From Swiss-Prot:
Protein name: 4-hydroxy-3-methylbut-2-en-1-yl diphosphate synthase (flavodoxin)
Keywords: 4Fe-4S, Iron, Iron-sulfur, Isoprene biosynthesis, Metal-binding, Oxidoreductase
Family annotation (Pfam families): GcpE (PF04551)
Pathway the protein contributes to: Isoprenoid biosynthesis; isopentenyl diphosphate biosynthesis via DXP pathway; isopentenyl diphosphate from 1-deoxy-D-xylulose 5-phosphate: step 5/6
Needed co-factor(s): [4Fe-4S] cluster
EC number: 1.17.7.3
Positions with a binding annotation for [4Fe-4S] cluster: C264, C267, C299, E306
Signal peptide: none
Family affiliation: Belongs to the IspG family.
Highest taxon listed in the record's lineage: Bacteria
Any one GO biological process: terpenoid biosynthetic process
C-alpha cells in the first residue's frame, strides 16, 4: 500500500514519518518518581521491541526522575505533560527525546510559545496530543460538543501557534474512544497537513476489547496509507500494547520481524487437540527472532495444502500429525510429540 508522505521527525535515535518504518510506542504505568520500577518496566518493553516510550510527568519530582531514567534506558523517552508548561521546559533539560503536550490544558499561547522555543533550542520534537476529553471551551461551544471537526480545529490551532515561532518538528495525534470519530478525524487532518501522525484509540479498554477497537481504528487508517507511529492503549500490561501493535502492522505487511503464527479454527475433521497444541506452540515461539511463518492446521485439507506458503507447520491426523516445510512433509509424529518435534525443526531452520 502507498503511505502518505510526511515530514521526517527525529525522536532520539528513531525517526517518525517520511520513509521511516512505522514505530510502535507504549506508556509506562509505573510511578515515574520511582526510578527503579520505571526503568525495570522500560527494559522489559525494550525486550519486545518497543520503539519509543512515554512517561507521565505530574510534578517536579517526576521531572527530576526523568534525568535518571533516560541514562539507564536505550529507547527514546517522551515526557507527557499536562497543565504546567514549566514541567515541559524542565523535562527538556532532563534528557528527554520528545514532548507530548495537550494544548487544550497546557496554558495560553504565550506559555506554549515558551515551551516551543526551548524545544527548538534543544532539538526536541513536540507531539500535539489532542483528545476528545480535553478540547478548548470555545471550540466545544462552536461545534456544540466533541466531533471530528472540533478535534481537527484544535490540532490546527496549535500547529499554527508552533509555526508562528518557526517550530516545525511536530507530530500530531487526534484521539477519541469513538473509533469512527477517530478515523474521521485522522483522515481530515491528514488531508490538511504533512506532519507525521501518531495513531491511537484513547481509553480503548481492557486487552480483549481494547485490542479489537485499536485494530479497527489503527488498521483502517494504516490500510489507507495514513499514520507514522502507533500506540495501542490498553488497561493492562504495556507489553501487551507492543505485541498488539506489532501484530497490527504484521497483518498489513508493515512489519516482518519475528514469527508470523497462523492456525486454523478447527472443525469436525480435526482429530487432534489442536487448540492445546496451537496455544503451546504460540507460547514457545514468543520471542523467537526468526523471520518465518508457522502454521498449525487441524487436518490435511488446511495443511499443508492451504498453508503451503508457510515456512513450516503441522497438519493433524488421527492421533498423529505431519510436520511440513514449504508444503512438503518432512516428519510424521505422535500427537504428544508434535510440539517438541516442531520446535526442534524450527530451531534448525
Amino acid at each position: 500500500m502507498d503511505r502518505k508522505e510526511t515530514i521526517k521527525i527525529k525522536v532520539g535515535d528513531k525517526f517518525i514519518g517520511g520513509d521511516s518504518p512505522i514505530t510502535v510506542q507504549s506508556m509506562t504505568n509505573t510511578d515515574t518518581r520511582d526510578v527503579e520500577k520505571t526503568v525495570e518496566q522500560i527494559k522489559k518493553l525494550e525486550e519486545v521491541d518497543c520503539d519509543i516510550i512515554r512517561c507521565a510527568v505530574p510534578d517536579d519530582e517526576a521531572c527530576q526522575a526523568l534525568g535518571k531514567i533516560t541514562k539507564k534506558i536505550a529507547i527514546p523517552l517522551v515526557a507527557d505533560i499536562h497543565f504546567d508548561y514549566r514541567l515541559a521546559i524542565k523535562a527538556i533539560d532532563n534528557g528527554i527525546s520528545a514532548l507530548r503536550i495537550n494544548p487544550g490544558n497546557i496554558g495560553n499561547e504565550e506559555k506554549v510559545n515558551l515551551v516551543s522555543k526551548k524545544a527548538k533550542e534543544k532539538g526536541i520534537p513536540i507531539r500535539i496530543g489532542v483528545n476528545s476529553g480535553s478540547l478548548e471551551k470555545d471550540i466545544l461551544n462552536k461545534y456544540g460538543g466533541v466531533c471530528s471537526d472540533a478535534l481537527v480545529e484544535s490540532a490546527l490551532r496549535h500547529v499554527e501557534i508552533l509555526n508562528k515561532v518557526d517550530f516545525h518538528d511536530i507530530v500530531i495525534s487526534i484521539k477519541s474512544s469513538n473509533v469512527n470519530q477517530m478515523i474521521e478525524s485522522y483522515k481530515k487532518i491528514s488531508s490538511k497537513v504533512n506532519y507525521p501522525l501518531h495513531l491511537g484509540v484513547t481509553e480503548a479498554g481492557t486487552p480483549w476489547r481494547g485490542i479489537i477497537k485499536s485494530s479497527v481504528g489503527i488498521g483502517t487508517l494504516l490500510s489507507q496509507g495514513i499514520g507514522d507511529t502507533i500506540r495501542v492503549s490498553l488497561t493492562g500490561d504495556p507489553i501487551e500494547e507492543i505485541k498488539a501493535g506489532k501484530e497490527i502492522l504484521r497483518a498489513l505487511n508493515l512489519y516482518s520481524k519475528g514469527v508470523e503464527f497462523i492456525s486454523c479454527p478447527t472443525c469436525g475433521r480435526t482429530e487432534i487437540n489442536l487448540i492445546k497444541i496451537a496455544k503451546e506452540v504460540e507460547k514457545r515461539l514468543d520471542g523467537f527472532d526468526k523471520n518465518i511463518k508457522v502454521a498449525i492446521m487441524g487436518c490435511v485439507v488446511n495443511g499443508p495444502g492451504e498453508a503451503r506458503d508457510a515456512d513450516i507447520g503441522i497438519a493433524g491426523g488421527k492421533g498423529y500429525g505431519l510436520i511440513f516445510k514449504k508444503g512438503e512433509v518432512v516428519r510424521k509424529l505422535k500427537e504428544e510429540d508434535l510440539v517438541e518435534g516442531l520446535i526442534e525443526e524450527i530451531k534448525n531452520i
